Amino acid sequence: MIIIGGTATNGIDENLSKIISVPLLKVEHKVFPDGESYIRIPQHITNQEILVVQSLYPPQDKHFVELLLILETLADMKNNKITAIVPYLAYSRQDRRFKEGEALSIKTILNAIARAGADVLIVIEPHKEEELSYFGKEVKIADPMPELAKEVSKKVEKPFVLAPDRGALERAKRLAEQLNAEYSYIEKERDRDTGEVRIKNLPELRLSGKDVIIVDDIISTGGTMIQATRAAYEHGARKVISVAVHSLFLDNAYEKLINSGVKEIVTTNTIPQDPSKVTVVDVSPAIARKI
């Protein structure tokens, strides 16, 4: 077995190599003057079990193409089994057609990864588990909640886990079980034209004096988290901690979250982060459990 470190790993390939004691080989990579990517596997590998690590954080399209180049090159070398480890799976939120003629982007992405030569796919906390069926082969989902819970437990006294929507309820349950805490959810609706998020309904919440942990799979612009934070304080929360597996922090989302009352943010290294601003949890142990 050998680990191939791609062009967008954020150190996960190196950490994984140490945890499972498997050698790491980094791809050679450069960018041509016209912006196209050059990829080379620096030694001939054949008849091996391969683990390819490549996250699809921004620039997503470039990192995706580079993943395909790596996979097909390894497939051409006639290897036994190729596992694509994609910590952050871009386009995963485009899993349904809300309007006629829209691209079903996640289907295209997963089909391409399979065709390029991946036999197995490992992802961290997908937006929706059912969307992974488009890969058409073996899929493993690595769960980082034990690692996230370990960090969160250091920051709370009376934890209450809150999902910002019904879709995140199962995620909230998993974190709550790790923290031995209660959990609930907020009902929301999103305008498909403007992207605006509105709270539709609030189940009865007993948050007075509680340290509320709002957990979601992804922070993009932060709108969902901000709405949930305001609702938590309106229901008596003592403080709010934001937990997200994948954090993009677009459009000054970090500053907006802090201004909304979020006291701390705990996230992972599936996407590069500034450790002076957020607590960063390594997902490599979660991946190792699936190998």
Swiss-Prot record:
Localization terms from the record: Cytoplasm
Residue sites binding D-ribose 5-phosphate per the record: 190, 216, 220-224
Keyword Cytoplasm found: yes
EC number: 2.7.6.1
Active site positions, chain numbering: 188
Annotated residues for binding of Mg(2+) 2: 165
Pathway: Metabolic intermediate biosynthesis; 5-phospho-alpha-D-ribose 1-diphosphate biosynthesis; 5-phospho-alpha-D-ribose 1-diphosphate from D-ribose 5-phosphate (route I): step 1/1
Annotated SUPFAM superfamilies: PRTase-like
GO CC entries: cytoplasm; ribose phosphate diphosphokinase complex
Cofactor note: Binds 2 Mg(2+) ions per subunit.
A molecular-function term among this protein's GO annotations: ATP binding
One Gene Ontology biological process: 5-phosphoribose 1-diphosphate biosynthetic process
Keywords: ATP-binding, Cytoplasm, Kinase, Magnesium, Metal-binding, Nucleotide biosynthesis, Nucleotide-binding, Transferase
Cysteine-cysteine disulfides: none
Entry superkingdom: Archaea
Keyword DNA-binding: no
Reactions that this protein is recorded to catalyse: D-ribose 5-phosphate + ATP = 5-phospho-alpha-D-ribose 1-diphosphate + AMP + H(+)
Cofactor(s) annotated in UniProt: Mg(2+)
Binding residues annotated for ATP, in chain numbering: 34-36, 93-94
Predominant localisation class: cytoplasm
NCBIfam families, per database record: PRK00934.1, ribP_PPkin
Record HAMAP family: RibP_PPkinase_A (MF_00583_A)
Similarity section: Belongs to the ribose-phosphate pyrophosphokinase family. Class III (archaeal) subfamily.
Protein name per UniProt: Ribose-phosphate pyrophosphokinase
